[in-house]
């Protein structure tokens, strides 16, 4: 019968009760260990000191600077697109380096000829040897079929057969040029470099963190990030158009309504992107036509997440972090009334304002913004609230039950009573679809609790009961093309980055090398000791120089 107690006792026998063979093996192992530790201290192997260059900060930083790839080394800047409070956005394309070969094959006329490779360093089994034989046979047949002789690679059909065609026809098509948008954040004020580096802005940190986590076809895709000369460069996929440009095209020089089918497609894709943000607990807080991009293939993408913020498990209130959010014309009424906490409904109000602007070709609530005073006090936006009341009417407790709870509620009592004029405005702007007007009412609801959310807005009759289904391409069915985005090529201040970076890298390398030579290649610990010794010597020297004066004073 199995006895667990006996097994436990056998497992933990004292050393003297174990078989002599085991003890002999342990003695032999201990003897070998002692034999290998001859010349060591207390039987321990001596520590091998690493190369001092590893612990030297100067050469390490210089080496990292030399290895770092500059944004201008990887991208060719064509010009800048727009400028704002955060900095500038540039249009760029990838640099083409025709002199280097790729890892998969050599470069042929700007393209990589990929031939299956086999790693000869790995142990080969029978199946792997058969695979290699098949690969070699395939390679020989490929060269034979293409008329390629060793040492000569042909890229035209003329070299293959003289009876084919006298005109050269390239087998490999040249790839299309892919453009990118580089967003450079400001580090200088009024063209003068700051004396003290204040670090990366909060807006840049939020945008980098969120763009690295969020992935949706209706959000601008972040390609990579560069940190160069204390400046952040964020590389995005390029979008040829934005809603502000499209609205301007239809409103100048004379008004021409945007096709209803195009408006429906834009709104559906926009709401789909907003729904994705809200389902991932992210508020955008700056939705406006200028931040809604449209690619050349008609895909709507939401950009500029500089004011975006997660609203799940917050450490502080939304008002504490940012007291002013959303551009004034697209700001929700609860924000105008001083709400300290708000919901994703503020984004849906902005979407409603964008919807109205696509219909009327101008902002529906175009108020004048009151600026901050010298004390940086947030002013009450009287004119903006008045523009909203003139179109939607004056709210009351029946429409907005918690209206009296807002800090700036008393401001509403100062206005005269307005009636609802949204339907009148809609028909005067040329709107004919009753479902579009219904969705507009749901998006521009005063009460943020009753305001429709993005998920339910996608199921609205405006999208589900239309004669023409929603298209994934907003340009589908158009007989005209929108002009390309205007690029400013006369103000490429980012081009000065390359020469300054190169000079600074060389200077830092020289300075670091000189410092390392002066200290004799000392490691970090020895450098600290040397500095401490120098400081002690300086102090003792000062004390010795002060000693004669003290003696004179005593006399």
Curated annotation (Swiss-Prot):
Binding site for ATP: 81-89, 183
Entry's localization field: Nucleus
Pfam families given in the database record: Pkinase
GO molecular function, one term: metal ion binding
Catalytic activity: L-seryl-[protein] + ATP = O-phospho-L-seryl-[protein] + ADP + H(+); L-threonyl-[protein] + ATP = O-phospho-L-threonyl-[protein] + ADP + H(+); [DNA-directed RNA polymerase] + ATP = phospho-[DNA-directed RNA polymerase] + ADP + H(+)
Enzyme type, top EC level: transferase
GO cellular component: CKM complex; mediator complex; nucleus
Entry's Gene Ontology BP terms: meiotic cell cycle; negative regulation of filamentous growth; negative regulation of transcription by RNA polymerase II; nuclear-transcribed mRNA catabolic process, non-stop decay; positive regulation of transcription by RNA polymerase II; protein destabilization
UniProt EC number: 2.7.11.22, 2.7.11.23
Sorted UniProt keywords: Activator, ATP-binding, Kinase, Magnesium, Meiosis, Metal-binding, Nucleotide-binding, Nucleus, Repressor, Serine/threonine-protein kinase, Transcription, Transcription regulation, Transferase
Up-regulation conditions: Protein level and kinase activity are reduced during nitrogen starvation.
InterPro entries: CDK, Kinase-like_dom_sf, Prot_kinase_dom, Ser/Thr_kinase_AS
Region (Disordered): 100-166
SUPFAM superfamilies: Protein kinase-like (PK-like)
Protein's job: Component of the SRB8-11 complex. The SRB8-11 complex is a regulatory module of the Mediator complex which is itself involved in regulation of basal and activated RNA polymerase II-dependent transcription. The SRB8-11 complex may be involved in the transcriptional repression of a subset of genes regulated by Mediator. It may inhibit the association of the Mediator complex with RNA polymerase II to form the holoenzyme complex. The SRB8-11 complex phosphorylates the C-terminal domain (CTD) of the largest subunit of RNA polymerase II RPB1 at serines 2 and 5.
Record-stated family: Belongs to the protein kinase superfamily. CMGC Ser/Thr protein kinase family. CDC2/CDKX subfamily.
Name under which the protein is recorded: Meiotic mRNA stability protein kinase SSN3
UniProt gene name: SSN3
């Amino acid at each position: 019968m199995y006895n667990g107690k006996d097994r436990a006792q056998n497992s933990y026998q004292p050393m003297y009760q174990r078989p002599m063979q085991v003890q002999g093996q342990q003695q032999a192992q201990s003897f070998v260990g002692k034999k290998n530790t001859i010349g060591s201290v207390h039987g321990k192997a001596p520590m091998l000191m690493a190369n001092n260059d590893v612990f030297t900060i100067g050469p390490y930083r210089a080496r990292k600077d030399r290895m770092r790839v500059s944004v201008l080394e990887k991208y060719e800047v064509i010009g800048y697109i727009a400028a704002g409070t955060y900095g500038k956005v540039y249009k760029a394309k990838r640099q083409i380096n025709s002199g280097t070969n790729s890892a998969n094959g050599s470069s042929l006329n700007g393209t990589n000829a990929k031939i299956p490779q086999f790693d000869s360093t790995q142990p080969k089994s029978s199946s792997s040897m058969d695979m290699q034989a098949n690969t070699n046979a395939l390679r020989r047949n490929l060269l034979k079929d293409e008329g390629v002789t060793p040492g000569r690679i042909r890229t035209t059909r003329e070299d293959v057969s003289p009876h084919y065609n006298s005109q050269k026809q390239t087998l490999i098509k040249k790839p299309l040029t892919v453009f990118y948008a580089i967003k450079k954040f400001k580090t200088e004020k009024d063209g003068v470099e700051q004396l003290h580096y204040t670090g990366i802005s909060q807006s840049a940190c939020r945008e980098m963190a969120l763009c690295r986590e969020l992935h949706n076809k209706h959000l601008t895709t972040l390609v990579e990030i560069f940190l160069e000369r204390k400046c952040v460069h964020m590389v995005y996929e390029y979008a040829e158009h934005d809603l502000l440009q499209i609205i301007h095209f239809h409103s100048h020089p004379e008004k021409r309504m945007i096709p209803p089918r195009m408006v429906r497609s834009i709104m559906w894709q926009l709401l789909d992107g907003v729904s994705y943000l809200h389902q991932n607990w992210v508020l955008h807080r700056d939705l406006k036509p200028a931040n809604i991009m449209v690619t050349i293939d008609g895909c709507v993408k939401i950009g500029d997440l500089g004011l975006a913020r997660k609203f799940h498990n917050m450490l502080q209130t939304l008002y504490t972090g940012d007291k002013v959010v959303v551009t004034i014309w697209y700001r929700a009424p609860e924000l105008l009334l001083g709400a300290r906490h708000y919901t994703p409904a503020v984004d849906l109000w902005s979407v409603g304002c964008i919807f109205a602007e696509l219909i009327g070709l101008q902002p529906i609530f175009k108020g004048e913004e009151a600026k901050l005073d010298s004390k940086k006090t947030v002013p009450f936006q009287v004119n903006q609230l008045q523009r909203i009341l003139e179109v939607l009417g004056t709210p009351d407790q029946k429409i907005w039950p918690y209206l009296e709870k807002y800090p700036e509620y008393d401001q509403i009592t100062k206005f005269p009573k307005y009636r609802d004029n949204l339907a009148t405005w809609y028909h005067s702007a040329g709107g004919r679809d009753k479902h579009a007007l219904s969705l507009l009412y749901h998006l521009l609801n005063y009460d943020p609790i009753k305001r429709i959310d993005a998920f339910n807005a996608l199921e609205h009759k405006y999208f589900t009961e239309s004669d023409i289904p929603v298209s994934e391409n907003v340009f589908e069915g158009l007989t005209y093309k929108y002009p390309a985005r205007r690029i400013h090529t006369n103000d490429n201040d980012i081009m000065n980055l390359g020469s300054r970076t190169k000079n600074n890298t060389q200077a830092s390398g020289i300075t670091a090398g000189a410092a390392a030579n002066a200290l004799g290649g000392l490691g970090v610990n020895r450098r600290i000791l040397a500095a401490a010794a120098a400081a002690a010597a300086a102090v003792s020297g000062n004390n010795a120089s002060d000693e004669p004066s003290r003696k004179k004073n005593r006399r």
